[in-house]
Swiss-Prot record:
The keyword Transmembrane applies. The keyword Cytoplasm does not apply. This is Uncharacterized protein HI_0044. Keywords: Cell membrane, Membrane, Transmembrane, Transmembrane helix. PANTHER family: BAX INHIBITOR-RELATED, MODULATOR OF FTSH PROTEASE YCCA. Its main location: membrane. One of its GO terms (molecular function) is calcium channel activity. One of its GO terms (cellular component) is plasma membrane. Pfam families: Bax1-I. It is a multi-pass membrane protein. Belongs to the BI1 family. InterPro entries: Bax_inhbtr1_CS, Bax_inhibitor_1-related. GO terms for biological process: negative regulation of apoptotic process; regulation of proteolysis.
Amino acid sequence: MQSRLIVDAQKESLLSTHKVLRNTYFLLGLTMAFSAVVAFISMSLNLPYPNIIVLLVGFYGLLFLTNKLADRPAGILAAFAFTGFMGYTIGPILNMYVARGMEDLIMLAFAGTAIVFFACSAYVLTTKKDMSFLSSAMFALFIVLLLGMVASFFFQIPALSVAISALFVVFSTMTILYETSNIIHGGETNYIRATVNIYVSIYNLFLSLLRLLSIFSSDE
């Protein structure tokens, strides 16, 4: 009787995990598509890049709102608002690369981002390896990135820019591995939070790859 209860509990846990994972990927696909549409509109209208205050308030404000409402249906709307805002911010950046004749680099960065995301997801889903051991390294890397970004405001050093972009690629890749593992092992049970976390990682990964490609393809 006890063994049957254990088996039933395991099945229920597995079904719950699969549901969170399925909902996460579904919402991620929708928000990515919405973000791409907003980015296209932003590019078409040639909208300016937001100033630092609007950027910080928009990013952290909408991120906080999404996490606050993650347990309610309104959290889905907040997630779309957040990813839509991020799509708007990426439009002016892409226009800058298009103006410099670097459309091919945008496609390469997009392809590279897709490959990294699907490879990381496939690895975790296939091996079902627990990636929680990455948390300490991710925290340390986050501190390094924070210090590096602060330093970049005062010192315009090309090598520093390369290092920050490269570390962001590593950090984003680790985050995708960690978040996917966290879902399948029951550490994350809210698909809205999981979606936003993975979205931010993909966003940073894409921009970092694009920056690296532009640096190595130019005379900087």
